[in-house]
């Protein structure tokens, strides 16, 4: 199982289905006020924090920019420092977790910039 299996829209949908037996799209889970959806999003957030902590602990980046459709979930940016702080090796989290400047299509724009002009 790779990170993408869990830390993607499809992964959030699958986690929710396995926990609660209902199939919802990731954006529906993220936007819901339902307690079951909150549990699923919390698990996703904790899994993301553990993944990002590995990156922080190995590379010590100044900033990590989240990408893809789930980067639109504002709650991730609110809870991530709280979830990361106890699991990074430093005394406090110095890495900023940020949304993409041009939205969830930023990755596609960046890839297009790599295409040769000639």
State what each model feature region is.
Residues 1-118:
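ATP-binding/phosphotransfer module of carbohydrate and carboxylate kinases, centering on a glycine-rich
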């Amino acid at each position: 199982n790779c990170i993408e299996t869990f830390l993607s829209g499809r992964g959030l949908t699958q986690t929710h289905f396995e926990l609660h037996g209902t199939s919802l799209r990731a954006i529906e889970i993220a936007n819901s006020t339902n307690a079951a959806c909150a549990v699923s999003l919390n698990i996703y957030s904790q899994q993301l924090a553990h993944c990002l902590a590995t990156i922080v602990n190995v590379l010590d980046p100044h900033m990590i920019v989240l990408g893809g459709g789930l980067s639109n979930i504002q709650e991730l940016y609110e809870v991530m420092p709280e979830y990361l702080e106890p699991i990074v090796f430093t005394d406090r989290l110095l890495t900023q977790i940020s949304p993409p400047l041009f939205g969830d299509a930023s990755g596609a724009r960046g890839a297009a910039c790599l295409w040769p002009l000639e």
